[in-house]
A protein has these predicted regions:
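Conserved Rossmann-like nucleotide-cofactor binding loop
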Residues: 12, 19, 66-67, 121
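Glycine-rich phosphate-binding loop signature in dinucleotide/nucleotide-binding domains
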Residues: 54-56, 106-112, 169
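A short, structured active-site edge motif that brings together acidic residues
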Residues: 78-93
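Conserved Lys-Pro-Asp/Glu-containing loop-to-beta segment of HAD-superfamily phosphomonoesterases
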Residues: 96-123
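Acidic, Mg2+-coordinating phosphoryl-transfer loop and its flanking beta/alpha structural elements
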Residues: 115-157
Length: 169
């Protein structure tokens, strides 16, 4: 039985591509200034609030610093229970450590959780932690990883399909 969901943040829940160059430079002050321009993908908030209403725990596992994740989630009113940022695990994705840390914080077993992400590193991290993985390929940047995502348990090509996917768990 599914009791929790783990999500990547950037290009999975929000389109943060406007800040991509600043992120590459690790210029977090510039990145923060772009947060109001980030767009939550269509249907994402509805899906997350529905998950909450079903009693599912929600974790965000990101390769970005926790402070950034908190700012994005707060600004865009995205619900969550647990955050695992770049510095919160002993090794970053694609290591299993961020996923295992999220599982510990949610007090759930891998078989009770489904993970959602847009990159191969999300899939590798999830699968190596024993967590089912759903590929979220609605962003144009995800196309680079499309071939590698063939090992995902499910592939979603449109963000509005997220709610339907979660409603079935």
């Amino acid at each position: 039985m599914t009791r929790g969901l783990i999500f990547d943040l950037d290009q999975t829940l929000v389109d943060s591509s406007v800040a991509l160059e600043a992120r590459r430079r690790r210029d977090w002050n510039s990145v923060y200034s772009f947060i109001p321009q980030f767009k939550v993908y269509d249907g994402v908030k509805d899906a997350l609030f529905m998950a909450r209403s079903k009693g599912l725990r929600i974790a965000i596992v990101s390769s970005a610093p926790r402070s950034y994740v908190v700012k994005v989630l707060s600004y865009h009113n995205i619900p969550y229970d647990v955050i695992v940022g770049y510095h919160d695990a002993s090794a970053p994705k694609p290591s299993s450590e961020p996923m295992l840390q999220a599982l510990r914080l949610m007090a759930l077993n891998p078989c009770e959780v489904i993970s959602f992400g847009d990159k191969a590193c999300d899939m590798i991290s999830s699968r190596s932690a024993g967590v089912e993985f759903v590929a979220c390929l609605w962003d144009h940047q995800a196309n680079a990883d499309r071939y590698q995502m063939r090992c995902a348990s499910k592939v979603l090509n449109d963000s509005t399909s997220l709610k339907d996917c979660i409603s079935r768990v």
